[in-house]
Amino acid sequence: MAAHGGASAALDPEQWLREAEAAYDRVASYTAVFHKQQRVAGELLRKETILLKCRRTPFSLYMKWIERPYKGSELLYVAGWNEDRARAHRGGILRFVTFNLDPRHPGLMADNLRPVTSTGIGYLLESVATNIRKAIKAGELAFAELGAETVYGRKTRILQAVFPKDKARDYDGHRFVINQDLESRIPLRIRIYDRDGKLVENYGYENLVLNAPLADADFDPKNSAYRF
């Protein structure tokens, strides 16, 4: 539900980035319901809804798909563990077959723009920062605050970064729309559109719990709550 405040307001993008980066620097771990949708090879894929646990050091991910089309699938990745491979299995009748795959293995990349190691708020913020700072340096960024919006029950402000249409291929997209949580200052959702206005990437973090008390057991395939 949006509550826009009329005309957009100019904002210092570097100052905004530093604020968001400082907020994330205070986060050691988090849990969320991760919403993901991507356009791959020109096709907008179905939305994915994933229970996500993330720890920053060592970088660790646990993902469980909780809605179709991949309901019941699980994935574990811990930097340096399992020969730096992800451990994963599909849901349904394939749940008993477990794979150990490089994050860039075609089996994991088939329906993804990025490897699984690029999952999470940290990568999201890093990607936004890289694109924005590149455009600042080139003097071709339009950055503004568009108003307020409630996302996943949280109050957010809407930021928009627009890159030149004729140079959209130099960036991850033509237009980024970012919802920043007002309380934590963490980006809660980002949508990326191409030069034709088509949605290319959409990521959101619902029920986000920052500095969640995660332990090694949360990233252990022997965890009795998991089905590896």
Question: Where in the sequence are the language-model features?
Answer:
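An acidic-aromatic
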Residues: 43, 50-123, 198-201
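Gly/Pro-enriched, hydrophobic low-complexity segments
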Residues: 10-11, 39-41, 86-87, 106-228
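N-terminal functional modules and adjacent low-complexity/disordered segments of proteins
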Residues: 6, 12, 94-96, 181
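N-terminal leader/targeting segments and the immediate start of mature chains
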Residues: 2-47, 53-59, 67-69, 140-144, ...
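Extracytoplasmic
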Residues: 25-29, 47-49, 58-60, 70, ...
